[in-house]
Amino acid sequence: MYAIGKVYIYCIKLYAQGVCIMVQFISRRKADFGKAALFVALYACINICLVSLLKEGLYLHGLKGILSGGVIFALAGHFWNYRKRFLAIYAGMMLFLSAGLIIKLIDHVAVGGGEFLGNISLASTIWGSILLVWLCIENAAALTGKIKAGRIISSAWLFISLAILAVPNLVLWGYFALSQHYLRPDIVMTIYQTNKDEAIAYLMSQNPFYIGLAVAAFLLISVLIFKAAYTVCVTDRPSFASTPHGWLGILPMIVLLALGLKTTYAAKEYEPAHIVLSVRDSVKSYTMFAQNKEKRIQRLNALGTLPVLPGHKGIYVLVIGESETRNHMSAYGYQRETTPWLTQFAKEPGTLLFKNPYSNHTHTVPVLTYALSEKNQYNQVPLAKAYSLIEIANAAGFDTYWISNQERYGAWDTPVAEIASTAKHQVWLNGEVGTNIKTAYLDEELPIKTPDLKNVDNALVVFHLMGEHTTYADRYPAVYQKFDEAGTKRDEYDNAVLYTDFVLSRIYDLVKDNPHFQGLVYFSDHGEEPDLGKGHESTKFTNQMSRIPFVVHFSDSYRSANPALFETLKGQENDYWTNDLVYNFMTEIMGIQFLPINEPNLTLGNPAYDRTKDNIRTLHGERKIES
């Protein structure tokens, strides 16, 4: 304790000496102090003017953060004598370190005043602090005679700190060069969940010019950053002071200024930090969902078997499509005949072709995590505590099947894999764990590989297709290459849609004659934009990416037993709906009672359903639907 006390007292003395040096500096060099104050004021005015222009009105919030960043800037500027080249490089580094903010503005993404000032002030503080710490190391080495060691340490500090800060901002600029859009956290999450072959397929689908542009931008900016650091720290190397304690006193002052900034702006205001923290929270949420599986099952077991309404027990088939947009389906009015079977199927008395279904996101994992659980865009249920459709079906006494042509990626798509893992019967055509999207089987193998259902009288059977997943040409056999007018991605996509239509017919044929068959439901996880080559990236969002098919067919026996429910659904065929409400819909038509939560206003088939074009959302609540 005595030693700690001595260190503590020494630190206080050190800081006091630093303050004394600064006071002496102010009293003896009033001209320099006046110049520094002028630069702080100028810095603050520029920031206030910029954010006021952005907000279209005088914006005076966050002044403490602005001043903290300004003081760091002025302090660094003093030691470099406010040289024009230093100021130009300082401004350039601030712009670079504010990459996320600038790209958002270019991409017309809404930016708040606090977010704007937070990024600018943090960028100034980061760059200024790097320089001042480097200067302290160099000066301490000069005063102690440890020139060589000091040079190594200061160079390591400069290189490591710049590399750590440069990489995320370079990624932001690189992605912008590739896609002309801002990098959203969900894109990073998708990359985290993407395997090697899927990444290669994505790159191959991009314009080679933009790939080259992204690589060139990455290399050029990297060179410019380290050139700027070399210019500031070597070419324009400042002279050193002769008072060690004064120099070391700068360090706690930097810390205090940084703390002052932190009390004004949270770290998540800085765009790279915001992305990292958002991804971390998503991963944590998905991990907790997996870890809480046993707890959810125990809670359901404590409730006993969930009752099912009379006339509802039987076999239900849920088919999950992949990347299919209804804009390319002739059943929904597309000019090419891509869905001949579905077009005829829609005319049958038991079939409902919903006209306004939308996806809740444009990426598979977030879509299905919501679609197959209690969690949706409109409630506050924590994902970790949300029961899945499979868990509820098990608790209601249904036999559950998960039959997939997508590989069980394990770590890459934990929530979907966890939901599937609770099914009593699982068939993974491409194995339990995989690292590519080059499936060994086409989707038509799914009904062939399905366990025999002849002696099954009460079940939920889920099929997960590869559908129109990129690369489109890999999703169908040569015999389905019907559209090849120009050899475009559109032709390949339409061929894949045509093949999916055939697969749906085969799945229906598998169950239609089973006396216990009750209904078949088909929806796609999200849409696709093959016409513009944008795929389904949320940063490149178009309405077509969210426009999905939603088709339901009920057997004669189901309609006879539940005429009111069927008529209600028929009357809702034109209603707006998002596929995060699949859980609600399936539990409704399966007649499962005493659910952990009831949301009649979010449940198709319930007369209280109240979703409209004005109140449905996509991208997990971020975006309104535009039909």
PLM regions and their residue ranges:
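A long, amphipathic alpha-helix that forms part
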Residues: 304, 447-452, 483-520, 552, ...
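Transmembrane and membrane-interface helices of multi-pass
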Residues: 2-272
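Membrane-proximal envelope and lipid/glycan-remodeling enzymes
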Residues: 93, 104-127, 164, 173-175, ...
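Hydrophobic, well-ordered secondary-structure elements that form the walls
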Residues: 504, 525, 550, 582, ...
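Active-site-proximal alpha/beta segments of enzymes that process anionic O-linked groups
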Residues: 249-319, 323-481, 578-579, 584-610, ...
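Short, P/G- and charge-enriched loop/turn segments at secondary-structure junctions
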Residues: 303-306, 535-540, 570-571
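A short beta-strand-to-alpha-helix junction
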Residues: 380-387, 486-498, 540-546, 559-586, ...
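Histidine-centered active-site microenvironments of extracellular/periplasmic hydrolases
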Residues: 96-100, 337, 513-517, 523-563, ...
